[in-house]
Regions:
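Phosphate/ATP-binding catalytic cores across multiple sugar-kinase/actin-like superfamilies
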Residues: 57-61, 236-251
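Short, acidic/small-residue loops that bind anionic groups at enzyme active sites
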Residues: 94-117, 160-162
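General beta-strand structural signal in soluble alpha/beta enzymes
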Residues: 6-7, 75, 108-113
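Conserved phosphate-binding loops in N-terminal lobes of ATP-dependent enzymes
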Residues: 40-42, 46-67
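Short glycine-rich, Thr/Ser-proximal phosphate-binding strand/loop in the N-terminal lobe
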Residues: 10-48, 153-156
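Short beta-strand-loop/turn "lid" adjacent to the catalytic site in phosphate-handling enzymes
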Residues: 59-98, 102
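A short helix-loop
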Residues: 2, 9-10, 27, 129-131, ...
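Conserved phosphate-binding catalytic cores of ATP/NTP-utilizing and phosphoryl-transfer enzymes
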Residues: 1, 106, 110-134
Length: 251
């Protein structure tokens, strides 16, 4: 039985996992802690938290792992598959993975965080492997449409001219008093609103395939200040993003 270990230390989750020929053996993750009212962490603080989290998560992963079966360790070494792509938080995972690979005497496989997202989306959809397809990566630091070719090379097609979708969500959420990162909480609020009752609308701004959330965020902040119910604004935000992404993909 062959097994592979994976490590990812991104903004804002520490993740370690192991898979074998039968599937997922272990999948452990911890969200980084951000103080109430703040909209993120400095890279140095994120790096420190990742190191502390790995100290706990890695031994827990090895409890379920047959060490002798490990054939490689894969790590997200950078945000995107570009030579100039760099973010300090990924150094925590890279150092941890390199140490594990050296100790186990197996290869270290370096990938990018974005490639990991794409491959995770293909889990259960392997029929897409080996053929070109359109992909979209949406997070706090990325809002991109790209083409993935037969060799799994990623070519950027479009993105955002200002805020990323995740930043849009987090800024609205923090203004509502939610804890960063706000995605799950804002999504829950949106689920409480009944669109059949009407509600406010936020514009979906896309120019030449490139989106913009800066002006939309300003409008959403004004709605919060005006006392519009948070669930209604949350629904409007997700409706806006859905229409925005649709325009980007159809461009």
């Amino acid at each position: 039985m062959c097994a592979y270990v994976g490590v990812d230390t991104s903004c804002y989750t520490t993740s370690v996992a192991c898979v074998d020929e039968c599937g997922i053996v272990s999948d452990l993750r911890t969200v980084l802690s951000v103080k109430q009212g703040e909209r993120g962490l400095r890279q140095s603080d994120g790096l420190f938290q990742h190191i502390r989290n790995l100290e706990r998560l890695v031994p827990e992963m090895f409890e379920k792992l047959d060490v002798g079966a490990v054939r490689g360790v894969c790590v997200s070494a950078r945000p995107r598959p570009n030579e100039d792509s760099y973010m300090p938080v990924f150094l925590a995972g890279k150092a941890c993975a390199a140490s594990m690979a050296a100790a186990l005497r197996v290869p270290l496989l370096a990938a990018s965080h974005q490639e990991g997202h794409v491959r995770a989306a293909l889990y259960g959809n392997e029929f897409l492997m080996g053929q070109p397809f359109l992909g979209m990566h949406i997070s706090g630091g990325t809002t991109e449409v790209f083409l993935v070719d037969e060799a799994f090379h990623i070519t950027l097609l479009s993105g955002t001219e200002d805020l990323h979708a995740g930043q849009f969500v987090d800024r609205i959420g923090v203004a509502m008093g939610l804890r960063f990162p706000c995605g799950k909480q804002l999504e829950a609020l949106a689920g409480e609103f009944d669109p059949a009752t009407g509600g406010v609308k936020l514009p979906a701004i896309v120019r030449n395939g490139v989106c913009s959330f800066s002006g939309v965020e300003t409008r959403a902040q004004a709605l919060i200040d005006d006392g519009i119910k948070h669930g209604e604004i949350a629904y409007a935000a997700y409706d806006c993003m859905a229409r925005t992404f649709g325009k980007m993909l159809l461009y």
